[in-house]
Every structure is written in C-alpha cells, then in structure tokens.
Swiss-Prot record:
Keywords: Cytoplasm, DNA damage, DNA excision, DNA repair, Excision nuclease, SOS response
Ranges of residues in domain UVR: 204-239
Domain GIY-YIG: 16-94
Organism (species): Erwinia tasmaniensis (strain DSM 17950 / CFBP 7177 / CIP 109463 / NCPPB 4357 / Et1/99)
Full protein name: UvrABC system protein C
Assembly: Interacts with UvrB in an incision complex.
GO biological process: nucleotide-excision repair; SOS response
The gene coding this protein: uvrC
InterPro entries: GIY-YIG_endonuc, GIY-YIG_endonuc_sf, GIY-YIG_UvrC_Cho, Hlx-hairpin-Hlx_DNA-bd_motif, RuvA_2-like, UVR_dom, UVR_dom_sf, UvrABC_protein_C
Chief place where the protein resides: cytoplasm
The UniProt record lists the keyword Lipid metabolism: no
Keyword DNA repair among record annotations: yes
Short name of any one Pfam family annotated for the protein: HHH_5
Organism domain of life: Bacteria
C-alpha cells in the first residue's frame, strides 16, 4: 500500500452513490479506472487487509491519488467508465487495442445510385449495409455484387464526365448509366432494387422476381433477355447456396472466448439478416493476474460502448460466457441504441451452432497467436543475448526511400515484446535537404523522432538503422547532440548493411561506425528478427514514397500553368475524374469546370497537349 496516500481520510469524503473512480500513480498517470454502484463500498474494498489478488496488491501499492465522478445511475457510470478507459488507456485495465471503425457497403442516393465501400461517419445521403469485419470482406462483396448486378461503382466525378462507356461496361460489369441510351431508367432502378434486397438478406425475393421476369421474357419469345436473366438467377443461387444462413434472418454478433497462458482471444462473428458477413479475432491487452470474467466483461463493454462501435449494435449478442453484469450491460446497450438489445449465453438450435463456431475460431486463433509470440520471444531473447542486453522490450527501425532524390520518405517501424506494433508505425516526409542525400534524411528523421519528450515506456531498447556504417554514424551524431530529459544513452544503436548482392542472410551488423562489423549465421533467430523489422521498415517507407510520387505525378503537369493555383487544380482533377481524363478532354469540356473561363480552358488544353 502507498505510504503517501491517506486512504482513511479519503474514504471519509466518498459518497455511497454510483459513479466512476480514477486511480493515479506518483507521476500523475491514470493507472486504473473503475465504476461502482456504491462508490464508498467499492473503494473501501481496496484498503482492507486481504485484497485477494497480486494484481490488486500491485495496483494499490502505486496509488497516490484517486478522483471520483458521481453519476445519476449505474448505467451512466458504465458508459463513463469505458469512455475514461479509452481516453487514459490505464495499465491495470483490460484494453481493447483494435478500435478501428468498421466498413460498410454504401448505396448512394444519386439519380443513378452507385455502390461503394464506406468507413467513418455516415454523412452522405444513401443506405448503409453492414458492418463488415474488415475492408477485405467489403471488397469481396462489392466484386461479387458487380458480377451479379451490374450497378456502377465509379466516383461521381468520373460518372458525370463520361461521353462513352468505360471498360466495366465492355466486360458486362456495369450497365453504363453514364451514357444515354445504353440502359433504361426502369432497368437500372430494377437492378438497384435487387442489390438492396440482396444486401438485406432477402435472396428469395430477388430469385422470385428474376424467375418471373425470365418466364415472361421466354413467353414473349425474347430469348436473349431470358438467357441473361437465367444467368443472373444461376449466379444468385451459387452465392446463396455457399452461405451458412440462419432461417430466422437474425441480426446478431456471436462472441467466442478462449483464454490460455495469460492471453485471451475473443472471436466475433458478424451476422446480419441471417448471413455471416465475416468475423474478426481480438486479443485485448490483459494485465497479469486478471480473471477471465473481468477480461470478457471489459471487452464487451469497450467493444460496444466506445466510440464508433455504438453505431453497429445488433439486436442480439450471443457470448460464450456468463457475464457478471449481463443485465446492466444489456440495459446500457438498449438505452444507447434506442431499441432492445439482448445478451444470451446459453442459446439453442442454430444459435448454439454459431456459438460453437465462434468458440472454435477463438481457440484456433489463440493457438496461432501463442505460437507466433513464442517465436518472436525466442528471437528477441536471442538478439538480446547477441547484443549483451538484459532484455529487449521495444525496437524501432528506420529506412529511407526516394526516386532520384525526389519525394523522399522516411519510415519508423516499431516492435514490442509481441512483435510488430503497427498502430505505432510512422512515416516522415523529408524536406530541406540536398536531393538524394540519405545521410541528411536519416539525420532529419532521427531528430524529429527523438528530439522531444518521450514516455519512459516508449524509449526503445534497440534502434535499427538500415544502411550500414554511414547511416549509423549519422545516428550516433544525432544522439550525441540531443538535448532531452529522457535517458538518450539507453537505446543501443545497430546499423545493418546489406550484403554485396543484397541477399537475405548476408547482412553485416555494426555497433560502431568505425572498424569491422559482424555477421550472424543465416539460421540465427537473432538475425531473423532483424530481417523482419528491417523488411517491414523498407516496405513501409517505399509504400509511403510511392503514394507521394503518385500524388505529385497527378498534379505536376498542372502546376506549370499560369493562373492555376491549388484550388483550381483540385477542382479540375475532381470534376474531370483525374489527370488522364483532363488530358483527353476538349477545350469545351474543360470550360464547363466551375471557375474555368474559356480563355483559361484553352490555355490548359494546349499546355497539357504540348
């Protein structure tokens, strides 16, 4: 127990109402957030003789201050608790690290609606179908829809400026509503209705309508149309036969749980209108000594009560665990969504099959993750031994990418004890240096990265510099000149030079810019982790460089034209649908762009043609 914190005096001031409490350590950092129906009773339990777990003992020993927020109801306390957990990320709370919004399929409200992938706030007018577990599931579904229902998926800027149909029309994946006369308004609207029904899980209605139209066309001797409808019917049937579908048209999430070796996996199946849209495995950060009940309870709360997750609430949640506060959580979700949300742990029939499937997936994913962590732990231990370090808890690696000195981008990749920490990967646009000067680029990125205050937990044990002696010398110089409050002598700087023919396994490692380096055997686990972080850093840098180069390529031709500033440049590209359509456009078409006069259109036309 803390020698500074006076628990007796503090408890005299605490009310017995519901609310949320935040515990701070000596540095003023929030280390735990909790909620209580009775704050006084709950907080008193932390300062009794027998705390019941090592985790709680360790937590209480660090307490220097406790802040309390009183709420009207326990439901309010639950919502506030999860908002605070998201805000402060306390070390003693179970943390859901993946907090990305989910993608949807968007059907626009345009005159000729389009299909698209959407993620984020739902500002655009139209219909949203989902959520899907990831972007891949959305792309696969859009590709499938395009083959069955040839509805446009192009941006409005492209659609509005076409005078002839694109390749999608030529290969039968779009009806070509952009060009007058290719498809009737009635037929396009009918295909949109089919898409809407299909995404709503009403496959039978789609098939019934298609069959009726096919029979009508056949009876009227319109055999070519009947043949197209037959092919469309077969495509829909092939898709629906492959799906594991619930007869009830359920709208639910199914959560399977697996827990082993201090690691938890919660696998979520997303089911909408009876169809499995996909699934995703989650591995929340679990403090040592945490009970499974707390892990599951906290995960479910964070998953549905934090941020964007609240917009994706299903009608039912099936979970492979009896939650201690199931009724409270269900009441909170019901209040949040404005409709009844139920939580079930012992379903029957098809729902029991779904739960078994989620449980199996959770167990399989956990076995895979444990094996991966075992491998990365072994590799980091081997590298620590090679570098004569007690342990390696965090590594960072830097690489530079450019083309002939242009669009230079530096990348920083982060590994922790469990491998790649992708949420902390960063790219830096490098400017103000001589083109092609990799040393100056490395010098700049290291100063930007480390020339500021850094949390103690984020100071790397090893910094890998891709480039060998010269780049390592730059890193040593930067660190010698840093004027910072954190211990700049802590990170070990390691240079990595590729072999003469740049083959993996022939790398030379340098701890100092002078003298000979050393090599590790090709089968060395220590070398493997260096190769892993080096390759990730290279890929991250080159991807950023290519994106930057493509952006410049699309605007550089316009930048040379007098009278075309950033706003007009953006308007031209957006209205015409990109640089190539603009290059192919006539003077009259360019003059239709808002803000572009006939004289300026002529100037643009000749500048792009010559």
């Amino acid at each position: 127990m803390s020698n500074v914190f006076d628990s007796k005096s503090f408890l005299k001031t605490v009310t017995s109402q519901p609310g949320v409490y935040r515990m701070y350590d000596a540095g003023g950092t929030v280390i735990y957030v909790g909620k209580a129906k009775d704050l006084k009773k709950r907080l008193s339990s932390y300062f009794r003789g027998n705390l019941g777990s090592r985790k709680t003992e360790a937590l209480v020993a660090l307490i220097e201050q406790i802040d309390v927020t009183v709420t009207h109801t326990e439901t309010e306390a639950l919502l506030l608790e999860h908002n605070y957990i998201k805000l402060y990320q306390p070390r003693y709370n179970v943390l859901l690290r993946d907090d990305k919004s989910y993608p949807y399929i968007f059907l626009s409200a345009d005159h000729h609606p389009r299909l698209a992938s959407h993620r984020g706030a739902k500002h655009a007018k139209g219909e949203y179908f989902g959520p899907f577990p990831n972007g891949y599931a959305v792309r696969e579904t859009l590709s499938l829809l395009q083959k069955i229902f040839p509805v446009r998926q192009c941006e409005n800027s492209v659609y509005r400026n076409r005078s002839r149909p694109c390749l999608q029309y030529q290969i039968g994946r779009c009806l070509g509503p952009c060009v007058e006369g290719l498809v009737t308004e009635e037929e396009y609207a009918r295909q949109i209705d089919y898409v809407r029904l299909f995404l709503s899980g009403k496959d039978d209605q789609v098939l019934n309508q298609l069959v009726a139209r096919m029979e009508q066309a056949s009876g009227d001797l319109r055999f070519e149309e009947a043949g197209r409808l037959r092919d469309q019917i077969q495509a829909v049937r092939r898709v629906t036969e492959k799906q594991f579908v619930s007869n009830q048209g359920d709208d639910m999430d199914v959560i399977g749980v697996s827990f082993d070796s201090g690691m938890a996996c919660l696998h979520v199946l997303f089911i909408r209108q009876g169809k499995v849209l996909g699934s995703r495995s989650y591995f929340p950060k679990v403090p040592g000594g945490t009970e499974l009940a707390e892990v599951v309870q906290t995960f479910v709360g964070q998953f549905y009560l934090q941020g964007s997750q609240a917009r994706t609430l299903p009608s039912d949640i099936l979970i492979d665990f009896t939650l201690p506060e199931k009724d409270l959580l269900a009441a909170s979700l019901t209040a949040l969504s404005g409709r009844r949300v139920s939580i079930q742990s012992k379903p029957r029939g098809d729902r029991a099959r779904y739960l078994k499937l989620a449980r199996t997936n959770a167990a399989t994913a956990l076995i895979t993750r444990l094996a991966q962590h075992s491998t990365i732990h072994q590799r980091l231990a081997a590298l620590a031994q090679t570098l004569k370090l007690p342990a390696i808890g965090r590594m960072e690696c830097f690489d530079i990418s450019h083309t002939m000195g242009e669009q230079t981008v530096a990348s920083c990749v982060v590994f922790d004890a469990n491998g790649p920490l992708r949420s902390e990967y960063r790219r830096y646009n490098i400017s103000g240096i001589t083109p092609g000067d990799d040393y100056a680029a490395m010098n700049q990125v290291l100063r930007r990265r480390y020339g500021k205050a850094i949390e103690e937990s984020k100071i790397p044990d090893v910094i890998v510099i891709d480039g060998g002696k010269g780049q390592l010398a730059q890193a040593k110089e930067v660190f010698a000149q840093l004027d910072v409050t954190w211990d700049k002598s802590h990170p070990l700087l390691l240079g990595v030079a590729k072999g003469t023919d740049r083959k993996a396994g022939l790398e030379t490692l340098f701890l100092e810019p002078e003298g000979e380096g050393f090599s590790l055997p090709p089968d060395s686990p220590a070398l493997h982790v260096i190769q892993h972080i080096r390759d990730d850093s290279h890929n991250h840098a080159i991807t950023g460089h290519r994106n930057k180069r493509a952006k410049v390529k699309n605007t550089s031709a316009l930048e040379t034209i007098e009278g075309i500033g950033p706003k007009r440049r953006q308007m031209l590209l957006k209205y015409m649908g990109g640089l190539q359509p603009l290059i192919n456009a006539s003077k009259e078409e360019i003059a239709r762009v808002p803000g572009i006069s006939t004289a300026l259109a002529e100037k643009i036309f000749y500048a792009l043609k010559h």
